[in-house]
């Protein structure tokens, strides 16, 4: 039967999606299912790994039922996932020994503090391109092994398996036959040397993690195994693409050349700049990461992670009850000509790149008696654009590359006010992708390359299309005046301490 489709499984922090793409990269069908978030203690975030798989299976079933396609027409499956989230399971039974510890969770902060105090920061940064932070997988693995009875003994005997969510999904889809990850996900674990391309023995020793639990690291586009599950009506479909969600979005945005960058505006903001075959070491608070491994070559990226972006709109809606729907925020922002001197620094869980200060908290500056709800909403939206400029400035300094345009996706950038202000404050065109699901599209592209569904990146570039281009309209003096106010607000926030 002719292969007409690629299936992408997009496993995110709050939901899983199954999306079917055709040869032109168009969405044929989509299904989504949320799952339960677990908060055992303040600052801890966990998932039940079985709930994750149930959500994946449910979306696959719903998608196939809704589209009524012949499963045999699916050329391959691409998987993209919430990065860093950690699962450890029993190889024999396939049962997790503890909940998945989510990337957002801060429950390993004490371990990170101990490692930093012990002087490991420079070694970790040199090998991994990352910082010692509870964000990454390595300390989560250590925490589980330390807190589950007999886990260290079982791990040393090779009875346990570790994986990020891509690994967990593939293990289950292949009936426990395949234990793999790709370069992009491995590079986020704090255990992988992104230069030597290996699980690093010094890092494993530092965290007391046996190598026996680790998955094989493979390229981001190859056939890893075949499905062994009834959800595809007995058909064995190649699983052929893997990438962490932000790297997948970079690929889906067709950012294939050094200097090209994308920004995803979700709960947080994740900006990646392609740096080619060179791993650029950041001197300005960014992360160096593997973008993907393809055709025997590794390509790298610089990444800036912003913890609070679109969720500032949720805060305005749910916490402060300033409007009923998130989409209303644009109308409020448009009712005033400027921010009235108000700056919102949304450091609700600290500040990410390029500051990396988990101890600071959110603040508002510039309030006067004439400040209105509209000024407040506008200032909150503007905070996303200012934080993006913080990251871009660091990227351009590190990579010595001047950005020509910024490709964007995510719910928050569908706000036209936000998109225009972002272009104004960066002084570069902001291109909003026609397809919002660029993360899933990137995973589909990787699987399609491995199965021959697509022939080349050039073919994919032809499919990429703009929903709208926003060009800078603000003069330099005003732009720099506004940004100077933001920098002043951030400095004041960094200096404030809760008694």
UniProtKB/Swiss-Prot annotation:
Gene Ontology terms describing biological process = glycerol catabolic process; glycerol metabolic process; glycerol-3-phosphate metabolic process
- Cite the EC number: 2.7.1.30
What switches its activity on or off, per the activity regulation note? Answer: Inhibited by fructose 1,6-bisphosphate (FBP).
Recorded hits in PROSITE patterns, A to Z, give:
FGGY_KINASES_1, FGGY_KINASES_2
Enumerate the catalysed reactions.
glycerol + ATP = sn-glycerol 3-phosphate + ADP + H(+)
Q: In which pathway does it act?
A: Polyol metabolism; glycerol degradation via glycerol kinase pathway; sn-glycerol 3-phosphate from glycerol: step 1/1
Identify the residues that bind ADP. 13, 17, 267, 310, 411, 415
Which residues are involved in binding glycerol? 83-84, 135, 245-246
Q: Where does ATP bind?
A: 13-15, 267, 310, 314, 411
Q: Which GO terms describe its molecular function?
A: ATP binding; glycerol kinase activity
Question: Which residues does the record give as sn-glycerol 3-phosphate binding sites?
Answer: 13, 83-84, 135, 245
InterPro entries listed in its UniProt record: ATPase_NBD, Carb_kinase_FGGY, Carb_kinase_FGGY_CS, FGGY_C, FGGY_N, Glycerol_kin
Q: Does the keyword Transport apply?
A: no
Question: What are its GO cellular component terms?
Answer: cytosol
Please provide the record's keywords in A-Z order. Answer: ATP-binding, Glycerol metabolism, Kinase, Nucleotide-binding, Transferase
* Organism domain of life: Bacteria
Q: What does this protein do?
A: Key enzyme in the regulation of glycerol uptake and metabolism. Catalyzes the phosphorylation of glycerol to yield sn-glycerol 3-phosphate.
Which family does the record assign?
Belongs to the FGGY kinase family.
Q: Which PANTHER family match?
A: GLYCEROL KINASE, SUGAR KINASE
**What name has this protein been given in UniProt?**
Glycerol kinase
Q: Which organism is it from?
A: Xylella fastidiosa (strain Temecula1 / ATCC 700964)
The lineage, from the top, is: Bacteria, Pseudomonadati, Pseudomonadota, Gammaproteobacteria, Lysobacterales
């Amino acid at each position: 039967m002719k292969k007409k489709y690629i299936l992408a499984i997009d496993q995110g922090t709050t939901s899983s999606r199954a999306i079917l793409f055709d040869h032109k990269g168009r969405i044929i069908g989509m299904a989504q299912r949320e799952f339960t978030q677990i908060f055992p203690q303040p600052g801890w975030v966990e998932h039940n790994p079985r709930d994750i798989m149930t959500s994946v299976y449910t979306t696959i079933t719903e998608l196939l039922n809704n589209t009524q396609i012949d499963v045999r027409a699916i050329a391959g499956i691409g998987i993209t996932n919430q990065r860093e989230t950690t699962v450890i399971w029993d190889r024999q039974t396939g049962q997790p020994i503890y909940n998945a510890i989510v990337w957002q969770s801060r429950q390993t902060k004490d371990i990170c503090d101990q490692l930093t105090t012990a002087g490991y920061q420079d070694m970790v940064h040199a090998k991994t391109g990352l910082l010692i932070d509870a964000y990454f997988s390595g300390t989560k693995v250590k925490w589980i092994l330390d807190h589950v009875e007999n886990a260290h003994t079982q791990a040393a005997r090779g009875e346990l398996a570790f994986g990020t969510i891509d690994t967990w999904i593939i293990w289950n889809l292949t009936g426990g036959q395949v234990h793999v990850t790709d370069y992009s996900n491995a590079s986020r674990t704090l255990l992988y040397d992104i230069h030597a391309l290996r699980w690093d023995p010094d890092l494993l020793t530092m965290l007391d993690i046996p190598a026996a639990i680790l998955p094989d690291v493979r390229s981001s586009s190859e056939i890893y195994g075949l499905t062994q599950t009834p959800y595809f009506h007995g058909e064995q479909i190649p699983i052929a693409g893997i990438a962490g969600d932000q790297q997948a979005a970079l690929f889906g945005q067709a950012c294939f050349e050094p200097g090209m960058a994308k920004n995803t505006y979700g709960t947080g903001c994740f900006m990646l700049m392609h740096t080619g075959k060179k791993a650029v070491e950041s001197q300005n608070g960014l992360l160096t990461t593997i973008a993907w491994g393809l055709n025997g070559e590794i390509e790298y990226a610089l990444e800036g992670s912003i913890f609070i972006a679109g969720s500032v709109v949720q805060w305005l809606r749910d916490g402060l009850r300033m409007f009923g729907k998130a989409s209303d925020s644009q109308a409020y922002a448009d009712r005033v000509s400027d921010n009235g001197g108000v700056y919102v620094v949304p450091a609700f869980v600290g500040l990410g790149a390029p500051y990396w200060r988990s101890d600071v908290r959110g603040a508002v500056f510039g309030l006067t008696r004439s400040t209105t709800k509209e000024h407040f909403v506008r200032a909150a939206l503007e905070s996303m654009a200012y934080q993006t400029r913080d990251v871009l400035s660091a990227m351009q300094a590190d990579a010595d590359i001047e950005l020509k345009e910024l490709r964007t996706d995510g719910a928050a950038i569908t706000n036209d006010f936000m998109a225009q202000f972002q272009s104004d404050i960066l002084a570069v065109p902001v291109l909003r992708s026609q397809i919002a699901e660029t993360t899933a599209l990137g995973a589909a592209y990787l699987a399609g390359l491995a199965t021959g569904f697509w022939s080349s990146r050039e073919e994919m570039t032809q499919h990429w299309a703009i929903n709208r281009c926003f060009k800078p309209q603000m003069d330099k003096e005003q732009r720099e005046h506004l940004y100077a106010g933001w920098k002043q607000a951030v400095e004041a926030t960094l200096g404030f301490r809760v008694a």
